[in-house]
């Protein structure tokens, strides 16, 4: 991915949740002619600020980020849309003589960007509406069984309670007559969002990308960061933020926005499903699981450059790696 020195440089700053990626990206932007592009599936939504650890408006004015606050929570934002938007913004950045710096931890977005999405069809609102109407009549277990009949490979990988993925698999089949697993095979893609590095090439991401991963050295330190950050979110008013979303009346837990880690647990708490203490436990546990998945994925990334979140000279360490990469590139 990064061995072609003729390609323009880009920086991919990844890492598990609560590792400090955003702060590092902003610090780097003080030293580099770069444009910040968010790679976060929750920060895309307006009104979902506290629970996504979104920088506040004053910070965003000082350090502008692309792909933040671009969707209403009722509107899905797909990995395909992210890829299109990110590639467009990266091209604009390079054309302006700057460096695109992508920062965030959403695995499926990086997968789409680096591996591509093949010829899988885009979402179709009419077909989705038909599937949702059927689900209301017969239930999602029946639709999962329907999926098993037309695409047993996908059905075996998709949990019967995962409504979004059942819907997408049926949608693809109805639009194309081909099972979703056909596209997985054609792409060399893994349905569990693990990257197949044999299929990553410059055609998918035509950049000389420097891969940076930020994380604490010790897992228990990351867990402590996660717990502390969620407590701070609660103190900042996350419960009120979620209550405002509930009061709208057009949002529900089936939407990708509301299913986001932290938001889903606070929403359920406000619905009376459990008490505050259990909500905190469930939210922090879900966030730890997210971080574990992110770390597992990052360990498989080739040419990864690890940075310690505990390093007192973190910015300098990152700048050394970036400077080395820029020196190896052709001039912009």
Curated annotation (Swiss-Prot):
Keywords on record: ATP-binding, Magnesium, Nucleotide-binding, Transferase, tRNA processing
One of the GO BP terms on file: tRNA modification
Record-marked site positions (Interaction with substrate tRNA): 106, 128
SUPFAM superfamilies recorded: P-loop containing nucleoside triphosphate hydrolases
GO molecular function ontology, one term from the record: tRNA dimethylallyltransferase activity
NCBIfam families, sorted: miaA
Protein name per UniProt: tRNA dimethylallyltransferase 2
């Amino acid at each position: 991915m990064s061995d072609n020195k003729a390609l323009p440089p880009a920086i991919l700053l990844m890492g598990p949740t609560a590792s400090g990626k955003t702060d590092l990206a902003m610090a780097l932007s003080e030293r580099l002619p770069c444009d910040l592009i968010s790679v976060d599936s929750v920060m895309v939504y307006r009104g979902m600020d506290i629970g996504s650890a979104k920088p506040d408006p004053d910070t965003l004015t000082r350090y502008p980020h692309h792909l933040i606050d671009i969707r209403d929570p009722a509107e899905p934002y797909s990995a395909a849309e992210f890829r299109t938007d990110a590639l467009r913004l990266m091209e604009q950045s390079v054309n302006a003589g700057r460096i695109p710096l992508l920062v965030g931890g959403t695995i499926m977005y990086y997968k789409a960007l680096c591996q591509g999405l093949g010829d899988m069809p885009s979402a179709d609102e009419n077909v989705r509406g038909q599937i949702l109407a059927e689900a209301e009549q017969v239930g999602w277990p029946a639709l999962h069984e329907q999926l098993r009949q037309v695409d047993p490979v996908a059905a075996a990988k998709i949990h019967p309670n995962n409504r979004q993925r059942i819907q997408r698999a049926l949608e693809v089949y109805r639009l194309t007559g081909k099972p979703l697993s056909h596209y997985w095979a054609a792409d060399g893609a893994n349905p569990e969002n693990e990257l197949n590095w044999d299929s990553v090439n410059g055609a998918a991401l035509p950049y000389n990308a420097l891969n940076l991963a930020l994380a604490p050295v010790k897992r228990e330190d990351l867990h402590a960061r996660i717990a502390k950050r969620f407590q701070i979110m609660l103190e900042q008013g996350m419960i009120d933020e979620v209550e405002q979303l509930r009061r709208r009346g057009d949002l529900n837990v089936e939407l990708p926005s509301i299913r986001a880690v932290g938001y889903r647990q606070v929403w359920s708490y406000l619905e009376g499903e459990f008490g505050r203490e259990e909500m905190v436990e469930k939210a922090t546990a879900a966030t730890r699981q997210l971080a574990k998945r992110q770390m597992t994925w990052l360990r498989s990334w080739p040419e990864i450059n690890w940075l310690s979140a505990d390093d007192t000279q973190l910015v300098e360490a990152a700048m050394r790696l970036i400077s080395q990469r820029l020196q190896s590139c052709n001039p912009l």
